[in-house]
Every structure is written in C-alpha cells, then in structure tokens.
Amino acid sequence: KEVFFIVYFSNLISANICSCTIESAKTVTLLSGNTLGIEFSYSGLGTLVLEDTASLYQSDDSVVNTGIINLFRKTKPILRYDYTFWSSPVDNQKLIDVSPNTLFDKYLSFDTAGGWKEEPRLNNMLLGKGYAIRGPQEFSITSRAVYEAVFKGIPNNGKVEIELGETDSFGVVGNPYPSAIDAAIFLKKNNLKTKGALYFWMHHTPVTNFEYNSDDYAAYNLVGGVNTEASYSGVNEIIPDGKIASGQSFFVISNAFGTIEFNDSMRILGNNNAFFKPSKAGNFPRSNKIEKHRLWLNFENSKGAYKQILIGYMDEATNAYDLNYDAESLDGNQFVDFYSLIDDKKLVIQGRALPFSESDFVALGYSSTIAGEFSIAIDHADGDLSAQTVYLEDKTENIVHNLLESNYKFTTTAGTFLDRFVIRYNIETLGADQFKNQESLLCVSVKGKNIILNSTKDVMKEVSIFDISGKMLFNTKTINNTEYQIVNFKSSDQILLINVVFDSGKSAAQKIVFH
C-alpha cells in the first residue's frame, strides 16, 4: 500500500509498504530495532526519524528518494580521545554535523597512499567512504560515555562506488545505507577487488588489575569472524557476524586497483545493531545456509593479553591460500599475535577444504613481546567440530594435549615462534606429516611388558609415549644412546604412540600395540 502520514506519529513499528510520503512539518518516528521496508520511494516535506538500530530498507537500485530522514546512531562508550569510524547513510552530510563539539582538527579520512589525514570538518562525507572522528571535547578522558550522532538528509539508495588504491594498500570504506548490509554478499560482489576480509579496529578499556589490553582488529570473511577480547574480561565487544550496521565503516585491503561497489542486493532487514567503536589513531543470493565446521581458539595470559583465531572447514575453501576464506593477521595488538600458517601467510582466519578429515592438521604460530605463562584454549566450536576431540601438539615440549579436557598452559620467552604448535584431530596422525620418511631410523618392539627401542643411524635424545587420547604416559630426556629399554612399562592393553627425538634434531614416531 501507499502510505501518507498527515499527522505526527511517534511509535511506528516494522512494516512493509509500497511507498511513503510524510506531510510538511510532520514527524514520523520509527522505534528502535524496527524496520520500515519501502518498495518504491520515500518522499514528502516531513521527516522520518529512525531511532538507534532502526532501519529503512529498500531493494530496488533504481528508486530515487526525496524525503528527509534523521537517523540516530549510538556508539559504544567512548572517551574524549577515542575515534569512531563513521560512514554516512544520507546525502550531503557534513562531518561537523556528526560530532559538532569535536576539535576542528580531529576529523580524519584515510588516504591510500599516505594514511590518515586531517579532513576539513565542513566537507560533505563522500558516499561509501569511511571517516574517523574523535569524541566530543566535553567528554571525559577517564570515564566513558555513549555518544549519539544524528545523520540528517535524503537517505541513500542504489549503487555506490568508491575507488581503492593500488594492490595491498589499505582503504577505509563504509555502509552507505540506512539499513544493515550483508558482509558476505559485499565480499562476493567485490570478489578479487579486495583480499576478501573486513577489519574493524577495536579499542578496549583494561580491566582492573590487568597489565595489558587487547587493542586489535576484529576480522570477518566468508568463514566467520573473530573477536579481540576474552569473554570474561568485562569488555562487552561484538564478534563480527557478517552484518554491518548503518553508519559503520571498516578497513579493506586492495587486491587490485579499481573500484568497489555497494548496491541494494547487499541490504538486509533488521540486524542494524552491530556497531563497532574503534579508537586512537552480479546479483548474489541472500546468505543461504552453508556447510561450516569451525573452531575458535584463544591465546592469552592472566594479565589481559589476548588474541583469537578461527579455523573453519567449508564449501569452496581449499587448503591453499584463498581470497575471501583466509584473512591475514594485521598484528594490531602491541603485545601478542597468534595465527595459523599457510606457507608464509600468518592468518587470523583460515578456511580449509571439505570434507573434514580427522587426519588433517593445522600449524600455529605466535609472537609475543611478553615472557611468561600463556594458555591456548578452545573458545567455542560449531558443526562437526563441536563434538570433535582437538589436540594441541607442543613440539618444543613434546607434549600432545587434549583441548577438550582443559586449556593448555605453557611458558615462553619474548619473540616469534613459527614451529611450536600444531592442531590435530587424531593422535594417530602425530608425526606422520613431518616424520614419514624417518621411520627407518627407529625400530620399536614389545617383549612381555618391556618396550625396546633401537636407532639405526642416530643417537636417541628423548622418548615420549602417548595413549590415543593424547595423554603423555612416559617421558625421558636422558637417553644419549642408540638403544633404550623401558622395563616393566605400566599400561593396560592399548595402542601407544612412541615419539623419539634424536641428537640431530630429527624425530620419528611409531605406533605399537601394547599387551
């Protein structure tokens, strides 16, 4: 139906209509969390007010609006010196009108060649472009508060294009519509134009007694999203779920010089509340159910240093590096970085091929400016991985740990470590990937309750024995011989994995049946 508002209306809720006209000097308020879907145009001389998280949804790129909206957006709690990344959902929005009390030189845009630059605050915000604006000058520098911005103007609709820089350059772009958009459709529409990941800068308030905070980039690609703060920390941050709210901007990395496109096929009903607060300095179908099996891992210490990664098995991903399915870590955290590895790529999100196999394994690496105790833990999992046993192999300590049973704690020096950890799903695969050509170095036999080891070429340095659950049953580091016997080994009848480290640094692993 065509709807005409000739009186004030203060409590409009979700509705789908053909067109909307508001009479001069009249105001219609769409309540928070509701969506007004309009098939054709919005017009009239009145004003449509969209409360925070409300949405104006249109799906036809050819529709031209002439009516005015006032769209309100609330930030996460901020300090005076915090910057929020904005984009405009209306035409001809001036930067100063987003935050009138911000200092004149604290309105920034991102130049792909030179980084952040001061933007005259009387400039209009370009459609699809992202801007960083500091908090109002009257805001506290110690106590955070929510800031509410208002965007006034004709609501944007239809195709919006914005130019990216040369390959591997950063760009800051943003949702140009008064409704949320689907990040997966955005990435598919702009396939090969970007590296296939979106990055949202997050700033965290350190919790009392925490020595380190976790300022970093939350990331999202077609596999999923990762957060930048532990759930128990007291910082209520959002894991990117593929819904980008109106007014929100974000980083992309160019894969080729050219333009990226926003259009109405990306717009979605509702889901207009995932607004991130950053800080200092063809036609594609709607996202249908896709087979995914995902594992989120946390790397952290007891003082607040934290990094999360995601490993996911899904359609169209491969075990090689793939745009849209693998997202590189931007190493925005000044204390720690944690990643999975494909060749020389350090990945915060890694997509892997289906079907999932328990014989698969994933190498992990980390960097730390902090020495001391850390832990690696499963944050959560879904699909087949929600019930899958997950082992963490520590190659430095020769330990295989079942992460379903408990977090794995270890100590580290400061530095970068690319060859310490491996994720596995089956203890029987331990050693098969790296030491498959080393079996001839080792001969293992069982006589009675005695396990006898003989090395054909190298001196044995260390022996570890694991059961099939990954539990270490035996370890010694004082062999220094080519022969070694474990007398009267205490074990039930079961399959055991024998792992040997030689003086040369090589390793070998063999399975035995102990009875």
Pin down the residues of each PLM region.
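Extracellular beta-sheet-rich ligand-binding/adhesion modules
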Residues: 1-63, 117-121, 128, 135-143, ...
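Acidic, glycine-rich segments characteristic of secretory precursors and extracytoplasmic regions
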Residues: 23-113, 151, 159, 164
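Short acidic/polar capping segments at secondary-structure boundaries
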Residues: 55, 90-92, 136-138, 177-178
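Short acidic-glycine loop/turn motifs at beta-strand connectors
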Residues: 65, 111-113, 135-137, 254-257
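Detector for glycine-centered tight turns/loop "hinges" at secondary-structure junctions
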Residues: 113-116, 120, 397-398, 505
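Compositionally biased Ser/Thr/Gly- and acidic/asparagine-rich
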Residues: 125, 137-490, 502-515
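A short tyrosine-centered beta-strand micro-motif
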Residues: 131, 250, 494-500
